[in-house]
Design a protein with these regions (language model features):
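A metal-dependent hydrolase metal-coordination microenvironment
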Residues: 51-202, 206, 232, 239, ...
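Bacterial N-terminal signal peptides that target proteins for export
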Residues: 6-27
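Short catalytic/ligand-binding loop motif for oxyanion handling, primarily in non-cytosolic enzymes
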Residues: 109, 147-149, 211-214, 269-271
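Aromatic-lined carbohydrate-recognition surfaces of secreted/lumenal glycan-active proteins
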Residues: 201-217
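Charged catalytic cores and adjacent phosphate/nucleic-acid-binding surfaces used
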Residues: 41-70, 85-89, 151-158, 216-419
């Protein structure tokens, strides 16, 4: 049966949901009330309070590019999600995102009887209309949904989602989820990929390590995806989705020159799934773009200039992550304690990451170990004992909550000097 093969996230229990709701912050409540007062229930422009520092995802620009936080895998009631698209816009505004893509399943339509929509562009149109007047960019997209070998593939920057699905006969107008779905997946996945490619879509392989798709639970690229990657029809791969990170997917990205993608794949509320009111955050893709426009985001994605922010873990190629780390961590000052040769070095972290640092230099630190934390959006003073007063010091560090390969952490040299 179609629903048994195409399996999606299980619903939380009522008790779990009620427990989470008890802790929803005032800003989240204000968001929902604001939607009502702003005509949100008529699907008008979304309203969201100004994002707080505790919730907004913030990373500095690098010396060459703007750092944009985007979520390229989102669902609404127009497929198997449980909210209207304007709620997705409001959530993204609360999270301080720069762009989102509405990516409804084309074939899996559990709400079809209640929300029939022969035009599969409606989710994007609703979200784009809701975001008018804000600086949030809404991108068009769809999720091509099949069993292996294709699995699930997101196509972003499409012009017409209707051309990515082909249902023939009586099933075309059916509101029965199973009847429609079984008919929809008969159209070869490769033809859907070709249709998206003709529209200039950026395509990436979704949640490649799902155990119900690959029995080992380990990402293994198959002939279908390898061929499309070689032909320039597969451009990225999710290395993080919802609550998992797949190191094998990271290695696949490196081996096949695919963009690193991290997504929420949200179906319920962001507040339920990621608990931002308790310090959590949705997984996002950090795109290093020349400017904040849809065209620039598209260019950066095709150029593979991305990193992933997932559960306080930064994942990226060294060429992309290095400049971001250099922009995030800077030495503000250096001085010596009175009548000593103990240097105090003040390090500022302007990013959302709570960096777990390990000092790898030759000097002793005024700590119990060579490991220390550099908390997000704060300044930390580190004592260094060089043995004599030097005008300048270098602090080589390894950042253990970063990955530039599946087994390698990023390194950075902080340079301090007396003024």
């Amino acid at each position: 049966m179609f629903p048994a093969k195409i399996t999606f996230k299980a619903d939380k229990t009522l008790e779990q949901r009620m427990d989470v709701l008890k802790f929803v912050t005032l800003s989240s409540i204000t968001l929902l009330l604001g939607l009502q007062s702003a005509g949100g229930f008529a699907h008008d422009t979304a309203y969201a309070p100004t994002p707080s520092n505790q919730r907004a995802i913030e990373f500095p620009d690098t010396n060459k590019y703007k750092t944009l936080a985007i979520d390229l895998h989102i669902h609404s009631v127009f497929s198997d999600g449980h909210v209207w698209p304007n709620i997705r816009v409001a959530e993204a505004q609360q999270d301080g995102l720069d762009a989102i893509a509405m990516t409804e399943h084309l074939e899996w339509q559990p709400h079809l009887a209640d929300i029939p929509h022969p035009d599969r562009n409606r989710s994007y149109q609703e979200a784009a209309e809701s975001a008018k007047g804000s600086d949030l960019i809404v991108l068009s997209g769809s999720e091509i949904t099949r069993d292996l070998p294709a699995g699930h593939i997101n196509a972003i920057f499409i012009n017409d989602a209707n051309k990515l699905i082909n249902v023939e006969g009586a099933a075309k107008n059916s509101t029965d989820t199973e009847v429609f779905g079984k008919a929809a997946i008969k159209w070869p996945a490769q033809e859907a990929v070709e249709a998206a490619h003709k529209q200039g879509a950026f395509m990436f392989w979704n949640h490649p390590n799902w155990s119900n798709r690959e029995t080992s639970g380990i990402t293994k690229i198959n002939t279908f995806h390898a061929k499309n990657a070689a032909e320039g029809k597969l451009h990225g791969i999710e290395v993080a989705n919802t609550h998992w990170y797949a190191e094998a997917a990271f290695q696949t990205a490196l081996d096949y020159d695919l963009a690193l993608i991290g997504t929420s794949d949200v179906h319920d509320l962001i507040d339920w799934d990621y608990l931002p009111h308790e310090g959590g955050h949705r997984p996002v893709t950090l795109v290093f773009a020349k400017e904040k426009t849809a065209a620039s985001i598209k260019q950066a994605l095709f150029a593979r200039r991305t990193a992933v922010w997932f559960k306080n873990l930064l994942i990226g190629r060294e060429k992309d992550l290095g400049p971001l780390l250099a922009a995030s961590l800077k030495v503000k000052s250096m001085k010596y304690q009175t009548d000593t040769v103990i240097a105090e070095i003040e390090i500022e972290n302007t990013s959302d990451a709570n960096f777990d640092a390990r000092y790898t230099g030759p000097y002793s630190l005024g700590l119990s170990s060579d490991r220390f934390q550099l908390p997000a959006h704060s300044t930390t003073v580190i004592e260094v004992k060089p043995g004599k007063r030097l005008k300048a010091l270098e602090l080589p560090i390894t950042l253990e909550n970063t990955l530039v390969t599946p087994e390698t952490h990023a390194t950075l040299v902080l340079k301090a000097a007396l003024k």
